[in-house]
Amino acid sequence: MRILFQGDSITDAGRDHRNYHNMGNGYPKYAAELIRNAYPDADIEFINLGISGNRTDQLFDRMYNDMIALQPDVISILIGINDIWHRHGANRIETTDAQVEANYRAILERIKAQTNAKIMILSPFLLDNEEKEAWRPELDRLLPVIRTLAKEYADVYLPLDEIFAKALPEQPEPQYYSGDGVHPNQNGSAFIGKQYFDAIAPLIEGSV
């Protein structure tokens, strides 16, 4: 069984780009460890091809080499926050909500057409950070779009923004999961890894 992690810096998380079996220091590492421990006899290959800074259009552009050619059994995708990020700051790229939806739909359509992979969608999220509060209305517009796409295309949907919103009040301080509100720290990465494991387990049990 081949599991492919796709996305941006949250998935990349400092991985070794010379070796796609290197999970980096983010949630793929924690998810892979949990899966290996739970299914020690299963033949499962983990590939991480997240690339820091990627937007939805950039993920689409590299689909053949980084998704289709690999023919994974499961593709998980966490993408979208950079489409919002790049609307702000000096070097703006004004990607509209409609363009993000079209990009994401094109990615999912191509996966369906050219692979037999199960699809797992992880929603983008924002955590407690004053500088990123201006992004919240834009993310709140995008999340229902991604949820609708997940209902149409995905086998598993992980609404991370909602999950974090419920979990954060139980933690000792607002930046428990992330210092900058976008990139998870070790606590945040381990938390996503556990959510990922719980969500993907039924797909694994049906295949191994």
Tell what function each PLM region has.
Residues 1-52, 63-71:
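Serine-esterase "nucleophile elbow" of acetyl-processing enzymes
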Residues 30-45, 58-208:
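Alpha-helical cap/lid subdomain in secreted, periplasmic
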